[in-house]
């Protein structure tokens, strides 16, 4: 199965359907202006409602002090009981609100691990190591090269040391070494940036889909940083590329019931023991696009931390399609059919369609939480017209999420996925730039890719106070998850450069770079 062709065929079918009938541009222009006016009307509805109150206040200004005193005495005389009851009710409701409201979750800072330059894996290096293992057939080597050339990956992604060696040495000790290098590197950086003492961390959530040793990765961190004995430690495995946001959501839920706490979230993936050494094409795509990386995020529910935090967590939305057999099996770790029974992750033909359904469900849930009222009314009106009144001539209205968010961090799972989301959400190249550049510079780093993308936006100086960022990722299960953040301050790239913990900061002037549709592998015999 040629996954690249599958994605291309899927995209071609989509383009064919979309271009089957040219749109009526006159109607499109009219709708555009109606929509814009509607947006301004709803957005300014508060001011329209306040206007009568202002007029009443202006009228009351003509009252004399004696008139106001008489009015007050009158109300006091005849409505003392009702006023007392109202005041008591107000105090009760205020107390109830402050005692039951959700705790605010702040992101103090985060750090992404940047491997040493000795671990850089060019496209030529990847093909050279794949050829040297002597397992892949010539056809499958050509298949991997074709995937790699169209993947959108650049020449500076990273591979673990064990797989760059000749011959490679994928073993448990090397896998542990990779995990420790990535996790500890990211954690050291975030602790240095925030100045938080490891003993103050009360919650630890680690996610890594394919590498789950005993003791666990979370236990490694507890041991390394000597975290306190009552730390709430969680290790999430097998949850795919969307597990990073699942970890954020879990930490959020725990912080609601653990007052004055810090939560450390660590997201990574392990390549050493998960390089597929077989000839099942459905499993070879993962070899070509997954690369080394990880991130550490420090959250807090302490009100005093707001002034030094970067972001506030506004929403998390989780979607799970696992009840459907096709969705459950579309990303599946199994043994291949060869005699050696090599283990790999198989990607099915309908992966893109299933991802699209999960994405649709997730954004449909998220939309009412974040979209302006004008967008919600337009969406609801077209939905009623189509479903209730059966007016099929009206096209489904796609809300403009650019009105809800300034920045988009879309999981860098592959070029075809990014192309589809860009088209379906009508995003610009500027909005897609963090995701595309992350895929180019670091490859698919699984659940941590969202943080490399946010770090890119910070290094570019794009994050301003009040900006809203949408992180969205999808992965095995099949799951699609979202997180919405609001910037609490403007991020100054010069300060990030002084800390030297942003993986982009020393080379951000080189980006964005052009990413051609095909990047030929110039040689398959490179040695290092």
Swiss-Prot record:
FAE domain span: 97-388
This protein's pathway: Lipid metabolism; fatty acid biosynthesis
Inhibition and activation profile: Inhibited by K3 herbicides such as allidochlor, anilofos, cafenstrole and flufenacet. Strongly inhibited by metazachlor.
GO biological process: fatty acid biosynthetic process; response to osmotic stress; response to wounding; suberin biosynthetic process
Record field: transmembrane: 36-56, 78-98
Keyword Transferase: yes
Bilayer topology: Multi-pass membrane protein
Broad enzyme group: transferase
GO molecular function: fatty acid elongase activity
Protein function: Mediates the synthesis of VLCFAs from 22 to 26 carbons in length (e.g. C22, C24, C26). Involved in the elongation of C20 fatty acid suberin precursors. Functionally redundant with KCS20 in the two-carbon elongation of C22 fatty acids that is required for cuticular wax and root suberin biosynthesis.
Protein name: 3-ketoacyl-CoA synthase 2
Organism of origin: Arabidopsis thaliana
């Amino acid at each position: 199965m040629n996954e690249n062709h599958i994605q291309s065929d899927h995209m071609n079918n989509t383009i064919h359907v979309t271009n089957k009938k040219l749109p009526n541009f006159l109607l499109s222009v009219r709708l555009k202006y109606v929509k814009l006016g509607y947006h301004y009307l709803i957005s300014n509805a508060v001011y329209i409602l306040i206007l009568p109150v202002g007029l009443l206040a202006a009228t009351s200004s003509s009252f004399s002090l004696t008139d106001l005193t008489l009015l007050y005495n009158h109300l006091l005389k005849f409505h003392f009981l009702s006023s007392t009851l109202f005041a008591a009710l107000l105090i009760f409701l205020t107390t109830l609100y402050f005692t039951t409201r959700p705790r605010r979750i702040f992101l103090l800072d985060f750090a992404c691990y940047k491997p040493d330059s000795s671990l850089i894996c060019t496209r030529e290096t990847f093909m050279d190591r794949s050829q040297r293992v002597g397992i892949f057939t010539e056809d499958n080597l050509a298949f991997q090269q074709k995937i790699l050339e169209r993947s959108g990956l650049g020449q500076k992604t990273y591979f673990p040391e064990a797989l760059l060696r000749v011959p490679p040495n994928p073993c448990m000790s090397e896998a542990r070494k990779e995990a420790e290098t990535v996790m500890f590197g990211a954690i050291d950086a975030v602790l240095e940036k925030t100045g938080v003492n490891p003993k103050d961390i009360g919650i630890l959530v680690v996610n890594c889909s394919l590498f789950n040793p005993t003791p666990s990765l979370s236990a490694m961190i507890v041991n390394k940083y000597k975290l306190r004995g009552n730390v709430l430690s969680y290790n999430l495995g097998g949850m795919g590329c969307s597990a990073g946001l699942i970890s954020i959501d879990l930490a959020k839920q725990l912080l609601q019931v653990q007052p004055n706490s810090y939560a450390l979230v660590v997201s990574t993936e392990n390549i050493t023991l998960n390089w597929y050494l077989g000839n099942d094409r459905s499993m070879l795509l993962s070899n070509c696009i997954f690369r080394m990386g990880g991130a550490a995020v420090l959250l807090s529910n302490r009100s005093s931390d707001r002034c030094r935090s970067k972001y506030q967590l506004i929403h998390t939305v989780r979607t799970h399609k696992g009840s459907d057999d096709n969705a459950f099996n579309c990303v599946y770790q199994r043994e291949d059919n060869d005699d050696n029974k090599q283990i790999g992750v198989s990607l099915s033909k309908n992966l893109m369609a299933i991802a699209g359904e999960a994405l649709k469900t997730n954004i449909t849930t998220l939309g009412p939480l974040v979209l302006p009222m004008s967008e919600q009314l337009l969406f609801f009106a077209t939905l009623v017209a189509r479903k209730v009144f059966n007016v099929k001539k009206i096209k489904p209205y796609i809300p403009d999420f650019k009105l809800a968010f300034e920045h988009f961090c879309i999981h860098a799972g592959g070029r075809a996925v990014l192309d589809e989301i860009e088209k379906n959400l009508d995003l610009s190249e500027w909005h897609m730039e963090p995701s595309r550049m992350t895929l180019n510079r670091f490859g698919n780093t699984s659940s941590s890719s969202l943080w490399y993308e946010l770090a890119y936006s910070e290094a570019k100086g794009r994050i301003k106070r009040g900006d809203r960022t949408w992180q969205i990722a999808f992965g095995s299960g099949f799951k699609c998850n979202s997180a919405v953040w609001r910037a609490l301050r403007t991020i100054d790239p010069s300060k990030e450069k002084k800390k030297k913990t942003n993986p982009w900061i020393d080379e951000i002037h080189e980006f964005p770079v052009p990413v051609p549709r095909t990047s030929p592998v110039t040689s398959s015999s490179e040695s290092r």
